[in-house]
Amino acid sequence: MASDNVSSQKSLGFVSVRHRLDQGYFGGYLLINSVARPLEFHCTVPVQPTRAQSILFGPTLEEFLCGEQICRALLSRAKLQPQVVLVDAPAALCVRHWIDLPILWVRARGAPGGAPGGTLGGTSSEQSSSGELLSPTSLEHGFQTPSHQRNASEYAERSSEHYQFCCLDSYRSDLDAIDWLNESYAIEHDLREPFERIIEALSEAHPRTKAA
């Protein structure tokens, strides 16, 4: 979807990538304006790696699926270009190699797990294998967060009052986008909420497979 007469509006992008064991990997991309209204939304069909891909990509498989295949496709479809794109899984950060936009992984400040690790807000005690807290919406719809993380030395990190942001160290200038977030509306909003919208939309587009 895309709204009319929005080309001059400053926008903020959110990409959520989730996984279901029986269906594969899903991605959704939501762009919002200064009052958090949707400007564009795009989502993917499930992406299920082949056995050959699982073997050949090894531990880099989730970066390939989440970043190169899913996030790259989503961001390339958009008509609008946001000031920054926030992602909810570190495996998505590698899309930065193909997209000339600041890409930041966001989580609540003080989340467990060091840099990276932790979560984007929330109070659920359920955790993924990466240590990230899964939102109630993710759990309700059977989604898991991709667990891949690089070595901590490959990330650059910066904190604001309520959030921690990570990017790939080779693109550490992306952290300058936090200044725009601080100076604009964005940091005053719950940065988790747009991800929840994406997950709800993904669950509508791709219902859970019913047990036989």
Give the residues covered by each predicted segment:
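Two-metal-ion RNase H-like nuclease active-site motif
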Residues: 2-21
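Structural motif
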Residues: 83-85
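C-terminal folded domains that constitute the principal catalytic or ligand-binding module
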Residues: 131-212
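A glycine-rich, hydrophobic loop/mini-helix early in the fold
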Residues: 25-81
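Gly/Ser/Thr-rich loops at beta-strand to alpha-helix junctions
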Residues: 19-22, 88-94, 171
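Charge-biased, low-complexity intrinsically disordered regions
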Residues: 42-43, 53, 74, 104-106, ...
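Short Gly/Thr/Asp-enriched flexible loops that form oxyanion-binding sites at enzyme active sites
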Residues: 89-108
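Intrinsically disordered, low-complexity terminal tails and inter-domain linkers enriched
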Residues: 110-139
